[in-house]
């Protein structure tokens, strides 16, 4: 490009960021400037001009005056001259401004293509550069203006110059734009090549890594295959050796079996010979033994028979002595058992007598207690004491005089009152005082009297053995609400003394006092009408006594016997 062309070239406003740096954007800007100068400059009222003249006549006058003013005022400004000449060229620019604006509207909102090279071949540039409809419209408008208005040669020359400058500026702009596109395309191509090279290098590096990994894997596989080959070779060698061993063992065992069979045949022959020799020896030995047995059998039988007879005689003598001794012991035992049975019967009779005497005395004492408590029956009680008193005392005297009889329990006159001592059997016998306790309850059912009695019989060389037995029997009456019950519990403890006698070796045994419970139910006070009922106390009803006898014999001394008898009697006085 020359400097003159650059000097007179039209100014280009480049908006690379918004317009995309295209030729169509520059042309659009130039058209906008021309329209600006063509529309804003006139000073004519639009209403008057529209009413008096038609639209086709008014526009050229205004535009011609505007062009002359611009040319005289701004002759040095190329842009203004260009605009004035362009406007003075005819009214087709103004008329077709709307069509130009409509045609260039796609340029105002261009689509940025994906590639700068494609921008050069876009439809906008081709539409702006070569459009036959537009050229024809321009020529038609120019002919109309020329035919309508007379233009001077000077103005035509100026317009020609302006068009030349414009075409040169357009050429330079197009060339510069193409050079920019070329440079941009070269830069883009370089960037794409760089990216492709980087991708190619990365892919190549990846392939190299894969190749290295495959090489390492190949090495490991080769090593494993070599090891497997070694194992296979070693196993094949071992199998060959094992086959050789098996063949050797097979031949050895075949030889050994043959050898063992040969030895077995030899051994069997030897055994047959030995068996034959032994059978002959056995036959000879049996014959010799039979002869010897016949000779010695009689001698041995005689000796054994004599020895057996001696042993049998000795055993029979021993057993006869033992039988005689045991028969004597049996006779002694039978005599002792018979004697003990007689003693037992005598003891039972004495116990029954003593028990009856004690029960009678206790019943009389109980009746005296009832008579003392009731004021209405004092006379009948005194008469009964006078009637039965001497008999009781006579029984007591007879009991004291009889040495074999057991001691009688003393009557209880008042609670917690000791009884006087009594001599039993001889001077060495002493009586232990007895205590009686009586508890009376008036609330519901009964009152009870507990009388423990202990008697002691002693000898010069006797040891004491004590035993306490409690056998209570309580009989109450629930039929009469006003009745009272007195329960007397008697507990006796006796000490037996045994004395050895030289002549008869019999032991003197003490008699234990009876243990009994007497229950007397009284429903009404004792009066003259109840005396026949009180006489029943003399003959009480007897419950079957339970007696237990135990006898023991000591090993070193004669036998000592211990007997205990327990009896329970109850007397009921009922209306």
From Swiss-Prot:
Coiled coil: 191-222, 316-355
Compositionally biased region (Polar residues): 545-569
Centrin-binding (CBR) repeats: from-to residues: 142-173, 231-262, 263-295
Ranges of compositional bias, category Basic and acidic residues: 382-400
GO cellular component terms attached to this protein's record: centriole; centrosome; cytoplasm; photoreceptor connecting cilium
Start and end residues of each stretch annotated as Disordered: 1-26, 376-411, 538-575
Keywords on record: Acetylation, Cell cycle, Coiled coil, Cytoplasm, Cytoskeleton, Phosphoprotein, Repeat
Subcellular location: Cytoplasm, Cytoskeleton, Microtubule organizing center, Centrosome; Cytoplasm, Cytoskeleton, Microtubule organizing center, Centrosome, Centriole
InterPro entries associated with the record: POC5 (IPR033351)
Residues with N6-acetyllysine modification: 538
PTM (free text): Hyperphosphorylated during recruitment to procentrioles in G2/M phase.
GO biological process terms held by the UniProt record: centriole elongation; eye photoreceptor cell development; negative regulation of centriole elongation
Job of this protein: Essential for the assembly of the distal half of centrioles, required for centriole elongation. Acts as a negative regulator of centriole elongation.
Family: Belongs to the POC5 family.
Subunit description: Interacts with CETN2 and CETN3. Forms a microtubule-associated complex with POC1B, CETN2 and FAM161A. Interacts with CCDC15.
Protein name stated in the entry: Centrosomal protein POC5
Organism of derivation: Homo sapiens (Human)
């Amino acid at each position: 490009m020359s400097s003159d062309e650059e000097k007179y070239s039209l100014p280009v406003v480049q908006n690379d960021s918004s317009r995309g740096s295209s030729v169509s954007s520059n042309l659009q800007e130039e058209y906008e400037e021309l329209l600006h100068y063509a529309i804003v400059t006139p000073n004519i009222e639009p209403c008057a001009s529209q009413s008096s003249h038609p639209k086709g006549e008014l526009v050229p006058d205004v535009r011609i005056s505007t062009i002359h003013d611009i040319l005289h005022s701004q002759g040095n400004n190329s842009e203004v001259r260009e605009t004035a000449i362009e406007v003075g060229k005819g009214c087709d620019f103004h008329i077709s401004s709307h069509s130009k604006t409509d045609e260039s509207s796609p340029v105002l909102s261009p689509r940025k293509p994906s590639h700068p090279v494609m921008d050069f071949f876009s439809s906008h540039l081709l539409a702006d550069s070569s459009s036959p409809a537009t050229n024809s419209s321009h020529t038609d408008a120019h002919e109309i203006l020329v035919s309508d208005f007379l233009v001077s040669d000077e103005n035509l020359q100026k317009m020609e110059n302006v068009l030349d400058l414009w075409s040169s500026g357009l050429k330079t702009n197009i060339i510069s734009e193409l050079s920019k596109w070329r440079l941009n395309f070269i830069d883009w191509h370089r960037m794409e090549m760089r990216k492709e090279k980087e991708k190619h290098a990365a892919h190549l590096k990846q392939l190299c890594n894969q190749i290295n990994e495959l090489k390492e894997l190949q090495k490991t596989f080769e090593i494993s295959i070599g090891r497997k080959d070694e194992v296979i070779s070693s196993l094949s060698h071992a199998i060959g050796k094992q086959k050789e061993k098996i063949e050797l063992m097979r031949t050895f065992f075949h030889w050994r079996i043959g050898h063992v069979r040969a030895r077995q045949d030899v051994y069997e022959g030897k055994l047959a010979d030995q068996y034959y020799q032994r059978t002959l020896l056995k036959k000879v030995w049996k014959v010799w033994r039979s002869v010897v047995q016949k000779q010695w059998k009689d001698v041995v039988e005689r000796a054994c028979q004599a020895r057996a007879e001696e042993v049998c005689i000795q055993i029979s003598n021993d057993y006869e002595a033992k039988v005689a001794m045991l028969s004597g012991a049996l006779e002694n035992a039978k005599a002792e058992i018979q004697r003990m049975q007689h003693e037992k019967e005598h003891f039972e009779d004495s116990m029954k007598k003593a028990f009856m005497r004690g029960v009678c005395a206790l019943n009389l004492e109980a009746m005296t207690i009832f008579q003392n408590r009731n004021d209405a029956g004092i006379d009948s009680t005194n008469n009964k004491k006078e009637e039965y008193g001497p008999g009781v005392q006579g029984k007591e005297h007879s009991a004291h005089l009889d040495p074999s009889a057991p001691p009688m329990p003393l009557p209880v006159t008042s609670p917690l009152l000791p009884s006087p001592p009594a001599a039993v059997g001889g001077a060495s016998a002493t009586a232990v005082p007895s205590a009686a306790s009586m508890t009376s309850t008036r609330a519901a059912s009964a009152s009870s009297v507990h009388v423990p009695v202990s008697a002691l019989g002693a000898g010069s060389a006797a040891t004491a053995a004590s035993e306490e037995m409690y056998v209570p029997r309580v009989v109450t009456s629930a039929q009469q609400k006003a009745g009272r019950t007195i329960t007397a519990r008697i507990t006796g403890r006796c000490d037996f003394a045994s004395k050895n006698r030289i002549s008869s070796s019999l032991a003197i045994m003490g008699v234990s006092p009876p243990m009994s419970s007497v229950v007397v139910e009284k429903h009404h006070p004792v009066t003259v009408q109840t005396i026949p009922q009180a006489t029943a106390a003399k003959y009480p009803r007897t419950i079957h006594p339970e007696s237990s006898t135990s006898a023991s014999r000591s090993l070193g001394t004669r036998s000592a016997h211990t007997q205990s008898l327990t009896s329970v009697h109850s007397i009921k006085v009922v209306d």
